[in-house]
């Protein structure tokens, strides 16, 4: 399971700066989701090959009222969701009563935490450590988030305390043994295809899960890795194994009350990253809302195969249905590769067809293709539509190979590849999707330049080659001398 790290501290200690530094770009921020405080943000981050989810919480002072009190409550809830907490303090301002209150809360909750003394610029690190030692959080790690100083030491300390899962360890072993670290995932014998059911609260996720499982089944499977993990529900259908990753919480047959279903961003993001296929559930009567776009964007960024289920389709008038379909085409253009199903989870209409799309999307996401096949498609695409000229020179694309899966990563080699326009990349992506008959999965294309790998290198001759070269040169000199003597 992907670990969750929360940034906590009073206002203006540099949490957002640290968040943007670790996520590397503001584009990684999922954004302000409806129903959550605007100061609470979630991002997908990685450090030296290890992925984690980062939470930027609102500031906590201890004397909040009104809306600020609600924000502080949300920040404290984020602490509960996290595997690890980075407790940021301001080295310039020194220790405050708010810092002491937060430290006390972390101790009471028995949370694993590291004290981070931020804004250490032009301040003696030892003095800063001594300043905050009364907090009882151990030695503070000094950093300057705005400049990136101390970040390496901080992340090594944090990730060193979080155990690696089996997949990470296996990948590390492959790298250590010199094998190509490209993992082509497939359904394990135990889990089958892992399906994450995601969507906003009250769109019908719980009803859909139970409908797909069968009403006669009592859903009591609870295999959490931590106290806030999603519920994993293994089952079989038509001799195929599946595992639902359910973010709606534990429920039993006949006891589903979706109006009180709680939505957890962390659970949803973790479910997306751990799944093979995402079934994204929307409420047809509400249409497409910004919250839907945020969640779909994260699923797309994670590279997951996607199936869209538009629930509560029954009972809608013809005109309403036409309007919703128009809105889907207009607003979901960025996931136009995904199958869309119009269903009623309550009555079961159209639910059975979801399995076919899940199978097709998963197959498209993990199928291997040989280099010869991918290169032939590239050559045909280039013949039909040449890359543009750049400064009078034609961009040359030479060959392609598979670089990864789930999502498919196609690596294309050539010259001037850094100058390929986005429009031509989209053309190649659409060509691969059409020829390979891919459905339900995003495609990523990566370009490699045509640098000569032997440039600047000299061949080293063996002793045998040196002797042979010497004999040939001697023979050549003797032959040349004879020709001169004959003249």
UniProtKB/Swiss-Prot annotation:
GTP 1 binds at residues 9-16, 56-60, 118-121. PROSITE patterns: G_ENGA (PS51712). This is GTPase Der. Residues 448-461 have a biased composition (Basic and acidic residues). Residues 448-487 are annotated as: Disordered. Keywords: GTP-binding, Nucleotide-binding, Repeat, Ribosome biogenesis. Residues 3-166, 193-366 form the EngA-type G domain. Associates with the 50S ribosomal subunit.
């Amino acid at each position: 399971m992907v670990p969750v790290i929360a940034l906590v501290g009073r206002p203006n200690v540099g949490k957002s700066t640290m968040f943007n530094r670790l996520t590397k770009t503001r584009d990684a921020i999922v954004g302000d989701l409806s129903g959550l405080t605007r100061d609470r943000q979630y991002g997908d981050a990685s450090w030296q090959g290890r992925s984690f989810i980062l939470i930027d919480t609102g500031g906590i002072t201890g004397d909040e009222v009104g809306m600020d009190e609600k924000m502080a409550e949300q920040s404290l809830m984020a602490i509960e969701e996290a595997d690890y907490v980075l407790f940021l303090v301001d080295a310039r301002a020194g220790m405050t009563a708010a810092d002491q209150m937060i430290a006390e809360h972390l101790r009471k909750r028995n949370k694993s935490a590291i004290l981070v003394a931020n804004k250490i610029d032009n301040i003696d690190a030892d003095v800063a450590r001594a300043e905050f030692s009364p907090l009882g959080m151990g030695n503070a790690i000094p950093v300057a988030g705005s400049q990136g100083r101390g970040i390496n030491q901080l992340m090594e300390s944090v990730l060193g305390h979080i155990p690696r899962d089996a997949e990470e360890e296996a990948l590390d072993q492959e790298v250590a043994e010199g094998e190509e670290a490209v993992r082509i995932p497939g359904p394990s014998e135990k889990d089958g295809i892992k399906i994450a059911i995601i969507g906003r609260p009250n769109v019908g996720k719980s009803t859909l899960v139970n409908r797909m499982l069968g009403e006669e089944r009592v859903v009591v499977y609870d295999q959490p890795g931590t106290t806030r993990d999603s519920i994993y529900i293994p089952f079989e259908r038509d001799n195929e194994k599946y595992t639902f990753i359910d973010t709606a919480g534990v429920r039993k047959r006949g006891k589903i009350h979706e109006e009180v279903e709680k939505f957890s961003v962390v659970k949803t993001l973790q479910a997306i990253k751990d799944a093979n296929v995402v079934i994204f559930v929307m409420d047809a009567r509400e249409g497409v809302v910004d919250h839907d776009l945020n969640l779909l964007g994260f699923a797309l960024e994670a590279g997951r195969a996607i199936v869209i289920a538009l629930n509560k389709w029954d009972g809608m008038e013809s005109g309403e249905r036409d309007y919703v379909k128009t809105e889907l085409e207009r607003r979901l253009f960025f996931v136009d590769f995904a199958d869309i199903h119009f269903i009623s989870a309550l009555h079961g209409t159209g639910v059975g067809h979801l399995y076919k799309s899940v199978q097709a999307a998963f197959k498209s996401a993990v199928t291997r293709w040989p280099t010869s096949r991918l290169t032939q498609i590239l050559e045909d695409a280039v013949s039909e539509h040449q890359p543009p000229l750049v400064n009078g020179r034609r961009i040359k694309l030479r060959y392609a190979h598979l670089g990864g899966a789930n999502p498919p990563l196609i690596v294309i080699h050539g010259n001037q590849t850094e100058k390929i326009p986005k429009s031509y990349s989209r053309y190649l992506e659409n060509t691969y999707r059409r020829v390979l008959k891919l459905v339900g999965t995003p495609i990523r294309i990566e370009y490699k330049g045509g640098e000569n790998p032997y440039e600047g290198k000299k061949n080293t001759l063996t002793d045998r080659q040196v002797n042979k070269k010497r004999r040939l040169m001697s023979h050549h000199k003797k032959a040349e001398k004879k020709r001169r003597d004959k003249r």
